[in-house]
Curated annotation (Swiss-Prot):
Tissue note: Mainly expressed in roots and leaf sheaths. Detected in shoot apical meristem, organ primordia, including branch root primordia, and vascular tissues.
Topological domain spans for side Extracellular: 29-50, 107-128
Broad class of where this protein is predominantly found: membrane
Family: Belongs to the Casparian strip membrane proteins (CASP) family.
Cytoplasmic face residues: 1-7, 72-85, 150-162
Gene behind this protein: BLE3
Organism expressing this protein natively: Oryza sativa subsp. japonica
A GO BP entry: unidimensional cell growth
Membrane topology: Multi-pass membrane protein
Matching NCBIfam families: A_tha_TIGR01569
Keyword Cell membrane on entry: yes
Protein name from the UniProt record: CASP-like protein BLE3
A Pfam family that the UniProt record links to this protein: CASP_dom
Regions crossing the membrane: 8-28, 51-71, 86-106, 129-149
Length: 162
């Protein structure tokens, strides 16, 4: 049974790492230059702090998911990994939420604040960011499954009640 747990944990963590890395890479590669009323305008992820937070959070999540593969199941370190998984999940949720909020403003603007939508001028950039957000939500969902599975494994070690 321990081998099955270890294999399942490895598969889930590899999936989480792949999804998180994909989200970060797609966001990093989002860039477009366009002309708007004769003014050259460039859109890059690095111009928006929320997008930078997204990239850093998801890159850290990808690296962390790979590093935790080396942690032996049932050890005290695995309990620490579970706690770190929960914290990382909260960071990922915050990152995708903040990037999503900025994307919504870019797409729809905010009439109350007088902010105009910009996605009409930079379609490819906005679509690229949307793809990164979708990958981010997938990574967050997979990470949630990792947390639930890790919790199951840790509680089985503490109290094998079945």
């Amino acid at each position: 049974m321990a081998k099955v747990h270890r294999l399942m944990n490895a598969v889930l963590r590899l999936a989480a790492a792949a999804a998180a890395a994909t989200a970060a890479v797609v966001m990093v590669t989002s860039r477009e230059t366009t002309s708007f009323f004769g003014i050259q305008m460039e859109a890059k992820y690095s111009y928006t702090p929320s997008f930078i937070f997204f990239v850093v959070a998801y890159a850290v999540a990808a690296a962390y998911s790979l590093l935790v593969l080396a942690v032996p199941a049932g050890s005290a370190l695995s309990r620490l990994a579970l706690t770190t998984d929960v914290v990382l999940g909260m960071v990922l949720a915050g990152a995708v939420a903040s990037a999503g909020a900025i994307s919504d403003i870019a797409k729809n603007g905010n009439s109350h604040a007088g902010w105009l939508p910009v996605c009409g001028q930079i379609h490819a950039y906005c679509n690229h960011v949307m793809a990164a957000l979708i990958a981010g939500f997938v990574a967050l969902a997979v990470h949630f499954v990792v947390v639930m599975y890790s919790l199951h494994i840790v509680t089985d070690v503490i109290c094998p009640c079945h």
